[in-house]
Amino acid sequence: YEREVELGGYFMELGGWERAHGYAANEHLLEKYGNRVPVRENEWDNRHFWRVSNAEQLALSEDCGIINLSHFYMFDVEGPDHVALMEWLCAAKIGGDNNIGKGIYTHFLDDEGNVRADLTIFRMEDRCRIVDGADAGPRDYHYVKRIAEDKGFDVTVTDVSEEYTTIGIWGPNARENLKKVVSDPAALDPENFPFAAIRNLEIAGKKVSALRLSYVGEQGWELHMKYEDGLAVWDALRAEGIMAVGVETYANSRRLEKSLRLQNADLLTQYNLYEADLARPKVKEADFRGKEKHLEYRARDKQ
C-alpha cells in the first residue's frame, strides 16, 4: 500500500480493501497513446474512472506490468475428504494425481446448474487452496464450510487470507523480466513451467509459489508469498523497471479482452455456464452439484 501511495494510486474500496485502479505516476502514458485512450465525456460514464487505467493496459500489452492482488481471499480445505468435497463442489475435475501441483480455474454451481462462484483451486498434495475475490471470498468460504458440515465431509476449512499475499506479472515480456529476479531463471522456460503449473521460486531471498495462469489474456504468473515478504518481492520487480499497473486493468479491461466474466457482475445465479460461454468442452465423470441440470443445458440446441 505504501508503494502505491508513492505512485499516486487512485484508490477505491472492495471488500474492505483499498485498491489502486491506476497510478498518477503513469499519466505520461496518456501522451504516448494519445487518442487510443478515449475521453469519457458524460459524467455518469466517467464516475469512479481514471483515464490512466486505459493507458496502463495498453502498456502492459506491449511489455509487461505488475499488479497488486493483495485483496485475494484465500482459504485451505484439508483432511481425509478434501479432494472429495472439492470434486463435489466444482464443475472442473479436481481429483487425480495429474492435477496435483496445478491451478484449476473452476466454478461452483447450484442445484439448477447455474453459476454461484468463480474461482481458482490450488491442488496440493495435502490440501486444496481456494483463491477467490475480496467480495465473493467470505461468502464462498462459509458456503464450503456449510456444505462440508451438512454432507459429512471430514475436512477442516481455514481462512489463510492474512497469511499470504499475491502479485501478478503479465505481458508479452513477463517471462524475460521475471527471469531477472528469480534465483533459477531456467525454471521459467516453457518446457519447465507449463501453463496452469505451480512451481516454487525464490525472489529477493523470499520463497514464492508461482502459478502460470492469466486472467488478462497475456502470458504471466500469479506470485504468491508470505504476507511479510510481499514488499521485498514487489521492490525487486520494480527495481528492474517493471511498471506497476492498477487493478482496473486486471479486473476489467484485460479481463474483458480474454472474454472472462466477473462474479457478482456478469456472473449471477440466473446464468448457466453455457449462457456465460464458460463451459468446458467435456463434462467430468465424477458427480458434482448441479451436474444433472448442467447436462440438460449441454444437450440443448441453443440456450
Which stretches of residues belong to each language-model region?
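Glycine/proline-enriched, intrinsically flexible loops and inter-domain linkers
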Residues: 1-303
